[in-house]
Amino acid sequence: MENISSALLDWFYKNHRILPFRTDPSPYHVWLSEIMLQQTRVSAALPYYERFLAALPDIPALAACEEEKLHKLWEGLGYYSRVRNLQKAARIVCEQYGGQLPADYDALRALPGIGDYTAGAVASISFGIPVPAVDGNVLRVFSRLYNDPAAVTEPAVKKAFTARVMEHQPPDAPGDYNQALMELGALVCVPNGAPLCEKCPLAHLCAARAAGTALELPRKAAPLSLIHI
């Protein structure tokens, strides 16, 4: 398959949503946004994001925040382990990195509450490090692009898809590329209902569109059956 990055980035620069953590993609802002957007829609998270940053504008402020105030700022978002891990990580960053997130994928990945995806997002978007940031949107795009019926919830399959993602990533714009894939999955190659193929910059390359199988993808692993003895 020909490289997708040029067509994808052209589309992204013309069609991406204007979001505060894109306008100012500093490491703290990107990290906070990615944690808030876990299990929460963008439209719902934005007021919390802006209020949180107004109260705690940097990592040292987050590290020093009293628990009651911290939970009040998070109230309504749910999944409170997210904000507890945010503060744990902030305190480690203050102790070990002078209050600034490290410009290193592995160091980011080692912080509480930061998994492969969030580490990749911060590293690529804020620091320009050529690493993947693969979420459900990206897996869906690549499952359809290659018309691949493999179950994306399987670790080995996700690893193979991640390798494909990296084959197309331009070394000079890893953050924009990662965001473009996420945006394409969120706005065009949507999970529920028919994908908006007529608006997709990759439609001419999409194997699932050609085969008429886009609605069947991505596939997830079948649940294990219980055997009663």
Segments (PLM) and residue ranges:
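Catalytic cores of DNA base-excision repair glycosylases
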Residues: 2, 6-7, 11-198, 202-211, ...
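Conserved small/polar residues in nucleotide/adenosyl-binding loops
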Residues: 227-229
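An aromatic/glycine/proline-enriched structural segment found at the starts
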Residues: 221-222
